């Protein structure tokens, strides 16, 4: 039975009267069994559901144990989201030869989980150990769990615009909040390391050294070092070990007031190393996944730089078309996804020394620019992007011209995003944090 027959049986469609195109299926996905090397004569009115029907019946005929699954279909670098006829017309696909259709395992769309009201614009967001941590332009630190319950913690950051957060340590006990440590940075040029102890927020370290607002911070995998970037164009490396005296800052003059004496109880540290090299503000920093002595930064000077932190020197530089707003390196594939002050996320291979060559550009956002991109740490193909166009998009790197899913809900531009523990969290200028569950 061919697809025209199947479509007529399943849907009552008179597919036999439609134009036809010849297709063949293939897959690079290890989860998909060997697909018969057959050519199918398919009506151009066929859509994804029809193609799924044909492929599942074909596999089942060769594998009696096969259980029906949902597939996504790629033609070239674009997911099939319409009928074949519409797709062929829109993308001017050549139909004189056999059309090769790639099959990938389908996934469910992200499900809205929680909509959290924040006191101000949301500037950054992270997920760790069953909790979502975010900062705001009003200086607030908002913490909610997977159930949407907020933990109220007093934060001594009134009138201090916060821009970034990075988790330092998460407790070994699942979903526990006590014992969590994180570092935040903002407009007052400082970074502060906090710990949650017995339900209270405790200031553990002050990191002093930047001369202008801190834009970004990232902690390494063993929680011993942090790297930060600033509007002052510099990167600074910090030792997070409170017992380390080499980078401890001691004020020479005697403190006079009791308030100042209390403040002195929080140890202040200066940077281990300062690295200059950017010509404009540093917008994002990330530790290198394959070399703990290296890090990456991006800047409004249109560059992404890989640094040797021990030598405080540049290793390689990627030149982009616009000011970069964010980067993220996948822990498994080592590929780098980036966003700029335009509507296009771009994929680079930083191990390729001709790194300025873009591997892939992803077209889909409208107007404005992409504020942030974040990989799915469990899948080397998937990432999320958020934009000033008020949308988030979930992408598969195998399709550059159509996103997997569009995620709507925000009423103003989206400023930050993260993806971890099966959750996507986005923060916006509409003063909300939206949490979505992914399959």
Curated annotation (Swiss-Prot):
Gene3D superfamilies hit by this protein: YVTN repeat-like/Quinoprotein amine dehydrogenase (2.130.10.10)
GO biological process, one term: maturation of LSU-rRNA from tricistronic rRNA transcript (SSU-rRNA, 5.8S rRNA, LSU-rRNA)
Domain of life: Eukaryota
Region ranges (Ubiquitin-like (UBL) domain): 21-105
Pfam family, one: WD40
Subcellular location: Nucleus, Nucleolus; Nucleus, Nucleoplasm
Region (Disordered): 248-269
Main location group: nucleus
Sorted UniProt keywords: Nucleus, Repeat, Ribosome biogenesis, rRNA processing, WD repeat
Stretches forming WD repeats: 117-154, 160-204, 209-248, 277-317, 319-358, 364-405, 409-439
Record-level GO cellular component terms: nucleoplasm; PeBoW complex; preribosome, large subunit precursor
GO MF annotations, alphabetized: ribonucleoprotein complex binding
Functional note: Required for maturation of ribosomal RNAs and formation of the large ribosomal subunit.
PANTHER family the record matches: RIBOSOME BIOGENESIS PROTEIN WDR12, WD40 REPEAT PROTEIN 12, 37
Family to which the UniProt record says this protein belongs: Belongs to the WD repeat WDR12/YTM1 family.
The name this protein goes by in its record: Ribosome biogenesis protein WDR12 homolog
């Amino acid at each position: 039975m061919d697809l025209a027959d199947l479509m007529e049986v399943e849907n009552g469609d008179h597919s036999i009267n439609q134009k036809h195109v010849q297709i063949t299926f293939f897959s690079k996905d290890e989860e998909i069994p060997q697909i018969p090397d057959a050519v199918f004569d398919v009506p151009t009115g066929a859509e994804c559901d029809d193609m799924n029907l044909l492929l599942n019946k074909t596999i089942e005929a060769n594998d009696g144990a096969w259980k029906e699954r949902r597939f996504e279909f790629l033609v070239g670098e674009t997911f099939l989201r319409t009928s074949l006829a519409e797709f062929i017309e829109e993308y001017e696909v050549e139909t004189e030869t056999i059309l090769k259709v790639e099959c990938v395992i389908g996934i469910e769309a992200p499900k809205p989980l929680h909509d959290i009201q924040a006191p101000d614009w949301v500037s950054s967001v992270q997920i760790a150990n069953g909790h979502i941590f975010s900062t705001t332009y009003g200086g607030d630190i908002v913490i909610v769990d997977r159930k949407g319950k907020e933990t109220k913690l007093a934060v001594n950051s009134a009138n201090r615009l916060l821009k970034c957060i990075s988790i330092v340590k998460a407790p070994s006990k699942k979903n526990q909040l006590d014992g969590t440590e994180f570092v935040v940075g903002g407009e007052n040029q400082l970074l502060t390391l906090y710990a949650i102890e017995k339900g209270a927020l405790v200031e553990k370290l002050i990191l002093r050294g930047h001369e202008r607002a801190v834009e970004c911070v990232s902690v390494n995998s063993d929680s011993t070092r942090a790297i930060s970037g600033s509007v002052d164009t510099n990167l600074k490396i910090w030792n997070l070990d409170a017992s380390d005296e080499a980078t401890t800052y001691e004020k020479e003059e005697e403190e006079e007031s009791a308030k100042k004496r209390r403040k002195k109880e929080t140890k202040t540290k200066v940077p281990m190393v300062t690295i200059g090299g950017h010509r404009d503000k540093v917008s994002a920093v990330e530790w290198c996944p394959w070399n703990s002595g290296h890090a990456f930064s991006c800047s409004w000077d249109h560059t992404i730089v890989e640094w040797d932190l021990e030598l405080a020197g540049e290793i390689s530089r990627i030149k982009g078309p616009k000011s970069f707003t964010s980067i993220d390196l996948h822990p498994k594939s080592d590929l780098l996804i980036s966003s700029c002050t335009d509507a296009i996320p771009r994929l680079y291979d930083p191990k390729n020394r001709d790194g300025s060559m873009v591997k892939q550009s992803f077209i889909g956002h409208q107007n404005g620019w992409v504020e942030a991109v974040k990989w799915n740490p469990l899948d080397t193909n998937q990432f999320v992007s958020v934009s000033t166009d008020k949308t988030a998009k979930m992408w598969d790197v195998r399709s550059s011209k159509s996103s997997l899913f569009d995620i709507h809900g925000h009423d103003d531009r989206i400023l930050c995003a993260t993806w971890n523990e099966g959750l996507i969290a986005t923060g916006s200028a509409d003063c909300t944090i939206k949490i979505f569950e992914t399959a």
